[in-house]
Amino acid sequence: MKIRPLHDRIVVRRKEEETATAGGIILPGAAAEKPNQGVVISVGTGRILDNGSVQALAVNEGDVVVFGKYSGQNTIDIDGEELLILNESDIYGVLEA
Amino acid sequence: MKIRPLHDRIVVRRKEEETATAGGIILPGAAAEKPNQGVVISVGTGRILDNGSVQALAVNEGDVVVFGKYSGQNTIDIDGEELLILNESDIYGVLEA
Amino acid sequence: MKIRPLHDRIVVRRKEEETATAGGIILPGAAAEKPNQGVVISVGTGRILDNGSVQALAVNEGDVVVFGKYSGQNTIDIDGEELLILNESDIYGVLEA
Amino acid sequence: MKIRPLHDRIVVRRKEEETATAGGIILPGAAAEKPNQGVVISVGTGRILDNGSVQALAVNEGDVVVFGKYSGQNTIDIDGEELLILNESDIYGVLEA
Amino acid sequence: MKIRPLHDRIVVRRKEEETATAGGIILPGAAAEKPNQGVVISVGTGRILDNGSVQALAVNEGDVVVFGKYSGQNTIDIDGEELLILNESDIYGVLEA
Amino acid sequence: MKIRPLHDRIVVRRKEEETATAGGIILPGAAAEKPNQGVVISVGTGRILDNGSVQALAVNEGDVVVFGKYSGQNTIDIDGEELLILNESDIYGVLEA
Amino acid sequence: MKIRPLHDRIVVRRKEEETATAGGIILPGAAAEKPNQGVVISVGTGRILDNGSVQALAVNEGDVVVFGKYSGQNTIDIDGEELLILNESDIYGVLEA
């Protein structure tokens, strides 16, 4: 099952907490705060402007996005997995290698 | 009797709580929180934009929609059944198989 | 005497409480909450949009309308009868047989 | 002396309390609440829309208007008489015989 | 020294309290509330609308204007005299003989 | 070093308190309240309107401006001097000789 | 790794506190307040106006910007470095030599 988000909404799978350093050392308690990053699962068709035109979103499926500390409260369960529903305006930017 | 919703309003039949697992095991108390999903019964003619044009809604009769935790407070009784009145902006997306 | 509502306002006669079932059995105390339904008595000429055009209302005289629990606070007395003044945006939809 | 109201403002003379019934019976204390009706004394030239055009008001001098319970707080004294300053949006409608 | 108000701002000299009746009788304590009237000293070039056009103000230098009870908090001192800075929207109307 | 303000922002050097009268008499404690006047140091390129056009500001470098009592909270240090950052909408008008 | 900010967002590296004077004298405790200045690392593609056009931002990569005391709360960690996410409207201006 999947979800088709409406308009300027974006479905995001939150990045899992990293509880170990790159070198593999376990950091107990280090993951108390959930990371504000995730992978875009699907995007809406765009934001509807006052003049009726539709502005396509600036993120794409597969993008790794960073979002605000206080975003990510809206969640849905899809096949037992919790996904986030964000608005495009919740997203700060896209991480690039 | 049925209701014809105005403009960007949508009538939704809330999904019933599942109190048993897929395998049929009863989960007592598991349904304390109402599911934020439902089936679209009827949709309005569309949202009226500032320039006077009408934007048709992005959901259709029969769609299974997911909506916010704090939506679904507006209810009406039609032939003894409680239905929800949502705005299109309350809806996160449409579930697809 | 009658009232000609301005713009997007609508005059509604609230449906009387039903204190008996269809079969005629009296339900004492059953009507504690006022029904959020009524019949449209008269409608304004329409909502004025930002571009100056007038959008005719989507309800008509005689329609049975359903409105929000917290609407219906604005009342006027016409010939000794209390009528409601609603905005079109207070109205969820129109009941149809 | 008279006042020329600006734009969408309307000058209204509040209807006097009726402390007797049509049959002439005095109703002591019956007029505790001020009536939300009045006669239009003068109207502004119209509401200025975002596109710069002017929308003439939908009420005229001499109309008997009904307004909200919480409107009518803005008053001016003209030749010793207290008059109300309303916005057109404060007015529910016009009473007609 | 004088002030050139910007856009939709208006400089007003508040009418002095009248502490005597027309017949010259002194009314002690009668002027506790400042009058909400004044003479327009200068007006801005107009309100800028969303479409970029400028709407000239509907009051002119020398007009006697009435304004809201809670307007008139913004003051400036010009050559030792306190003048009011109002927005056009603070003004109810213009008094005419 | 200088600052180029963005859009409708204006950099202002606040007028120094005058602690002596024109005749040179010192007024102790007279300057408790900061004057709401200042000289414009630099102005932004203009306010961007909803239709995308840019509206040039109505004040110029060197103008003496008066601003609201509660404006002037935003300050920056340029070469050890505190300057104010105002929006054009904070400014009441321009003083002229 | 780098971040591509969306629309009117701007990534800024906050200026480090200067704890010594120009002459090299250490000022203990002088840096209690974080400086509201920083260098622009990357800028979004522009602000989307109501008419659907995109307004390019007025700051560029490498600009030294000054921003409000209460901005700069939104941070992201990029390769272990804390960067600020600002909106263009948070920025007062650009410092120039």
Swiss-Prot record, chains A, B, C, D, E, F, G:
Keyword Chaperone assigned: yes
Compartment(s) where it occurs, according to its Swiss-Prot or TrEMBL record: Cytoplasm
CDD domains the UniProt entry points to: cpn10
Keyword DNA repair among record annotations: no
InterPro entries, sorted: Chaperonin_GroES, Chaperonin_GroES_sf, Chaprnonin_Cpn10_CS, GroES-like_sf
Matches recorded under SUPFAM superfamilies: GroES-like (SSF50129)
GO cellular component, one term: cytoplasm
GO molecular function: ATP binding; metal ion binding; protein folding chaperone; protein-folding chaperone binding; unfolded protein binding
Keywords assigned by UniProt, alphabetized: Chaperone, Cytoplasm
Free-text function comment from the UniProt entry: Together with the chaperonin GroEL, plays an essential role in assisting protein folding. The GroEL-GroES system forms a nano-cage that allows encapsulation of the non-native substrate proteins and provides a physical environment optimized to promote and accelerate protein folding. GroES binds to the apical surface of the GroEL ring, thereby capping the opening of the GroEL channel.
Family, as annotated: Belongs to the GroES chaperonin family.
Name this polypeptide is given: Co-chaperonin GroES
Species annotation: Oleispira antarctica
